Amino acid sequence: MSRRKREEPWRYEAAIAEVETLIAQIESGELDLAEVVERFQQAAQTLKTCADFLEQKRQQVEIIIEQLGQEEEDLPES
């Protein structure tokens, strides 16, 4: 019976490390053109996922800041 490798949750830091690895492979000069294009495509897709993640987190932070501002307005003045 074969076991599936347990998928770990997606992490921004791991994705950036993956992109850095792909860039190093591309810059090594050891890949043929088809492999370079494949690695480039993988890096571009991973960076798009990272950008989407960062945008989502930015929006979450804005909501939190807005909520904090509203809570501050609701505090009684002393």
Swiss-Prot record:
Gene3D superfamilies: Exonuclease VII, small subunit (1.10.287.1040). SUPFAM superfamilies: XseB-like. One of its GO terms (biological process) is DNA catabolic process. GO terms for cellular component: cytosol; exodeoxyribonuclease VII complex. It is found in: Cytoplasm. It catalyses: Exonucleolytic cleavage in either 5'- to 3'- or 3'- to 5'-direction to yield nucleoside 5'-phosphates. Bidirectionally degrades single-stranded DNA into large acid-insoluble oligonucleotides, which are then degraded further into small acid-soluble oligonucleotides. Heterooligomer composed of large and small subunits. This is Exodeoxyribonuclease 7 small subunit.
